């Protein structure tokens, strides 16, 4: 399908207007919709509905606006939700006509069309052309402003007289606040009391009245409903509303004219309540049904996946909060009705894959998206790896849905990104407690870059070591490494997928020890190949290692903590050796923290 045939759908709106149909704010359809592909049409807005110049081209897409759905058949699928939508915006079966609602959406009062950019680095790593839809570049750094503003702009002055209200601690809150300020409407946002200050301050900065209420989201939501009824406020739902869905659908509208439809294979969307994917899928499947629309959820927040399997909405007992923008226990009623008919698949991803996707996006754009904002990229990578596209030149489009990242999450993401890329391996290794074992293990791992090394003396027979290092290809390199370790009479276990090890145990390795003649040193290691090997070889004549902790933090210098069992009368000799090595060092043997927590 060409871009020209796509835009004929817009021209049909003009014909329908001549037939007496009224559209809300048709003036907001951009002139580019008529002229970008050289179509000969005049500007048209709500004051020019009788302009005969609109009917200038014969549409090539028959039935793109008029649905030939049998009312008796479709009536079975009608949602119980009652929406206040003009009759001319309904299909014969009484459900919303999302093509018309999307084409007449009021989103361009508050945003510009967001770019669709080639992800060069991601394309190279996946072997397929990948494009990024930059919803992180809207005024509130997420797509949510589209649906929120479209809903509010559809309301009349009487409905907006007392103001609007929403319950949200995330991107929807900012979208409502920004739109309310633009429209000159009073907005109240209800958030749980434990909402981080950075989030509620951002909403307040946009002019909304922020009410912190309740210990959790359910209590805040109940308070929102109470206030709406008591003060006669208009509730702006985050996803389960036709105007919100249609507003998000304008992303699909933009994508279809930003890329050659003949080369477009699939669009990937993060899924929470379903508003984003419902809007995009419903529009795209009407215009370009050959394009796949694929949802992406996390393994611990997969309400849509389970609902599609059971063919009814399923409520999750608990949801993971890492990708908080999609942490929804129950998808919307209207969104589920639409999604169940219009999407092709749902793929699940984990935390490490999301962290890797955030890094991928950063390498391509130098922007840091939030976890839910990177889910589409993570899902695309998993889907393409499992289902190789028949045409390797077919484009994959990922929606970067948001970039409202909490700064304190960056450390966790940086630590887990390489695991998600399968570029880092975590091992638990048991080695014999004898001279040279530590160095032998190090020599097996090198010249690979070691990212962490933790060891604490426990007994005279064996030692347990926790280590991580970078590999080029985990699948091919790891079996060889494990074999080499086994040949040294050591036992190794791959714990790269062990959540307890990655999140907690790595920081608790060791504990108190009563090992004799131990001294503690803190050293600065240069981050270069051979630095650790140089240290081990230099000290082996004067001491043995009883504690060692190293963690690569991404800088030029790494901080190392080493417990050394110094041979009799060799303390001064050890200090001379440390000076000769040239690394900065501090003797921490009398540090009260060491004496209290690491010594028996």
UniProtKB/Swiss-Prot annotation:
InterPro entries noted in UniProt: ACT-like_dom_sf, Ser/Thr_Dehydratase, Ser/Thr_deHydtase_PyrdxlP-BS, TD_ACT-like, TD_ACT-like_sf, Thr_deHydtase_biosynth, TrpB-like_PALP, TrpB-like_PALP_sf
An annotated Gene Ontology molecular function: pyridoxal phosphate binding
Cytoplasm recorded as keyword: yes
Residues bearing the modification N6-(pyridoxal phosphate)lysine: 144
Domain named ACT-like: residues: 425-497, 519-590
Main location: mitochondrion
Compartments (UniProt record): Mitochondrion; Cytoplasm
EC number: 4.3.1.19
Regulation: Isoleucine allosterically inhibits while valine allosterically activates this enzyme.
UniProt keyword Amino-acid biosynthesis, yes or no: yes
Pfam families named among the record's database cross-references: PALP (PF00291), Thr_dehydrat_C (PF00585)
SUPFAM superfamilies recorded: ACT-like, Tryptophan synthase beta subunit-like PLP-dependent enzymes
Catalysed reactions listed for this entry: L-threonine = 2-oxobutanoate + NH4(+)
Cofactor list: pyridoxal 5'-phosphate
Pathway in which this enzyme or protein is active: Amino-acid biosynthesis; L-isoleucine biosynthesis; 2-oxobutanoate from L-threonine: step 1/1
Enzyme class: lyase
Record-level GO cellular component terms: cytoplasm; mitochondrion
Gene Ontology process terms (BP): isoleucine biosynthetic process; L-isoleucine biosynthetic process
Record text on subunit structure and interactions: Homotetramer.
Family recorded in the similarity comment: Belongs to the serine/threonine dehydratase family.
Protein name according to UniProt: Threonine dehydratase, mitochondrial
Species in which this protein is naturally found: Schizosaccharomyces pombe (strain 972 / ATCC 24843) (Fission yeast)
